[in-house]
Every structure is written in C-alpha cells, then in structure tokens.
Swiss-Prot record:
NAD(+) binds at residues 108-112, 130-133, 139. One of its GO terms (biological process) is phospholipid biosynthetic process. Zn(2+) binds at residues 182, 262, 278. This is Glycerol-1-phosphate dehydrogenase [NAD(P)+]. The lineage of its organism: Archaea, Methanobacteriati, Methanobacteriota, Stenosarchaea group, Methanomicrobia. Catalyzes the NAD(P)H-dependent reduction of dihydroxyacetonephosphate (DHAP or glycerone phosphate) to glycerol 1-phosphate (G1P). The G1P thus generated is used as the glycerophosphate backbone of phospholipids in the cellular membranes of Archaea. It comes from Methanoculleus marisnigri (strain ATCC 35101 / DSM 1498 / JR1). It is found in: Cytoplasm.
Length: 360
C-alpha cells in the first residue's frame, strides 16, 4: 500500500451520529398504576406535574394518578376534551409550561395532546394508556385531526410508560383489536420502506426494521390468544405497541410502522370522517397492500378476523366507492413517503382490490 493511501486512511474521520430517545422505564402489568409514584421518584423529573386526561379517562384512571401523586407533587390537571384540537394543544402547552413534567392518562387523543404539549414546552412525558388502540402510546409522533384529514406532528417520546393491564383489559375489546391491527400493519409498512430504499435510495435502519417486523410477527402468530377483556391479551398487545414505538424512535421517523396502509387510513378519515378506528383502517389497508406486494394477504386477513378486527370497508360503515376513492387518494397523503400505492394504481385496479377484500 502506498504512503499516500496510508495517510488517507489515517485522516478519514467517522462522522456519523444519531440521537435516539427511548423510554427509561416501561412498567406493564396488573395494578401497576400504583407504581407511578415510584416511577416518578426514580426519574426525578421535578416537584410539579401536569396530568392530562379526558372526561372518561379521568374517572377510569386519571383521578387515581392524581391521588397517588398529590402528597409528593404540586399536581395540576388538564382536561383534553372534544373541540378544536389545536386550541386544546395550545391550552395544554400553557399548563405544561409551569410544570416540571407531564403525564398523559387516556387514549389516543389524550396521549397525543400530552405528547405534543410536552414536546413544544421541552418537558418530559410519561405515558399512562387506558386503552391499547394504537402504537402512539410509546412513539415520537402524534396525530392531530384537521378539516383536511389527520396530520402527523413531532411529539415527545415517553421517558416512561406505565400500562396497567387491568385498566386496559376493561376497555372495549374493539380498542384492543384496533391496536393489534395497527401492529400487524407493520408488516406492510416495512415492505414499503424496503421498496422505497431499493427504488428511491431512502435510508433504511436494519435495527428498526427488524424490531418492527418481529413485533408484527408476534401478534400475527398469536392471534388466537387475543381475547376480550383478558389481561394476558392486554399484556401481549401493550408490549407490542411499546416495541413498535421504540422502533420508530430508533428510526427517527414513523417509517417502521407507517406505509401505504396508513396513507389509505388517513385518506379514509378525510373522505369518511369518524368511520372506523385508526388501527382498524390500517388493518384493512394492510390486506390490500400485502396483496400488492405479493405477500400473504390472506394470512393478514385471517389473523385480523381471529382478533376481531374488521377486514372490509363495509364492516366500518364505509361504502366501496369511498374505499376506492381512498386508495386512489392515498398517494396525495404525505407524497414524500413512497409506498406501493404510488406505483401507478388505476381506478380499475383499485376497484378489484376492494372486491378482493370480500373473498372467502
């Protein structure tokens, strides 16, 4: 080797860097809500806390969290009620600005409000989900509804997750089934990510991709174990949702859990607002996109059926024409995110795909 080559090797500097924010404490199990004081003490986040909850979720778990912390912290509460979501977030930010840290106790809307308020005020966030309906309980993204459909915003990933399986199992089974569908949809999300990597050169994280695939596989293979109001089921699904959120934090984006199936879900929300839960629509979208990828779409469909999640537009109150329109409109949702639905899908093909969903 020449002297010049040796000098070149000596002067070459490795300059890659990455910042990953992951939960420090993850506490899942029966009655673990009682361990919230210990979690807060372990993290040493400050002397004051803002507890964000909703009308129902405050009764379900929020009041208990308030009572547990009242003796040791200056507790302020905030109700994330229905209304203009951005106004709700603004008010939550005002409340968070005077608190040492933020706890979100509730479902998707409450958790997302708390995460965004935490992010915008540079406060640590603890996630206390009352339902396991989607992977937002542990991710660094939040979804906010607008007149033009849901928008995805940067949010504070939780420094801790405290998921009480007794509370989660008591929620309607539809919410748990929706969470399962959201996780199983990771299968097609990572296929879209790999497709974009091959065709567009999009950066890909093997660690995040592998974790996302493994998480989806666990629920896919154990669909028979997901039963209504079972703490074992809540345990399995909640661990998967946390794992999926961690995969997103490793990737630095929602790519490990969001592909064409999510774009279809967001398009449906825009065209048929209020029809179906987020995870339910992602599950239906995953059947379609798995078919387009040439994968085991029937396996996806059958797993969703076992869990109790819908597999057709009709099952969530959406007519087939609207589903076709959503498939065609999906390419306009986050156009920078390339998926299988951006490969020239025609109206005729979209109609055939929707018909395929009803096959036995």
């Amino acid at each position: 080797m020449s002297a010049d080559r040796i000098n070149l090797l000596r002067t070459k500097v490795f300059d890659k860097s990455k910042w990953m924010q992951l939960p420090r404490d993850v506490v899942i199990g029966h009655d673990v809500i009682e361990q919230i004081p210990a979690v807060c003490e372990d993290l040493a986040l400050g002397d004051s806390v803002l507890i964000v909850s909703g009308g129902q979720t405050r009764d379900i778990a929020g009041k208990r969290v308030e009572a547990l912390l009242a003796g040791s912290y200056d507790v302020v509460t905030f109700a994330a009620n229905d209304g203009n979501p951005f106004e709700t977030i603004r008010k939550a930010e005002e409340a968070a600005a005077t608190a040492g840290f933020v706890i979100g106790v509730g479902g998707g809307r409450v958790i997302d409000t708390a995460k965004i308020a935490s992010y915008n005020t540079d406060r640590h966030f603890i996630s206390v989900p009352t339902a396991a309906s989607h992977d937002g309980i542990a991710s660094s993204r939040a979804s906010v509804p607008t007149a033009d459909g849901n928008v995805s915003l940067a949010a504070e990933p939780p420094i801790a997750v405290v998921a009480d399986t007794a509370v989660i199992a008591s929620a309607p089974h539809r919410l748990l089934a929706s969470g399962c569908a959201d996780i199983i949809a990771n299968y097609t999300a990572i296929l879209d990510w790999e497709l974009s990597h091959r065709l567009r050169g999009e950066p890909l994280s093997e660690y995040a991709l592998t974790l996302s695939r493994m998480t989806a596989e666990i629920l896919f293979k154990n669909a028979d174990l997901i039963k209504p109001h079972s703490e074992e089921s809540a345990w399995l699904v909640t661990k998967a949702l946390v794992s999926s959120g961690v995969a997103m934090s490793i990737a630095g984006s929602s790519r490990p859990g969001s592909g064409g199936e999510h774009k279809f879900s967001h398009a449906l929300e825009k065209l048929a607002p209020g029809k179906g839960l987020h995870g339910e629509k992602c599950g239906i979208g995953a059947i379609i996109t798995m078919y387009l990828h040439g994968g085991d779409w029937e396996g996806i469909r059958d797993s969703l059926k076992k869990i109790g999640a819908p597999t057709t537009p009709a099952a969530i109150g959406v007519d087939d024409e609207t589903a076709v329109a959503a498939l065609l409109a999906a390419r306009t949702i986050r156009p920078e995110r390339f998926t299988i639905l951006d490969m020239g899908l025609t109206e005729e093909s979209a109609r055939d795909l929707v018909k395929m969903l009803y096959r036995e």
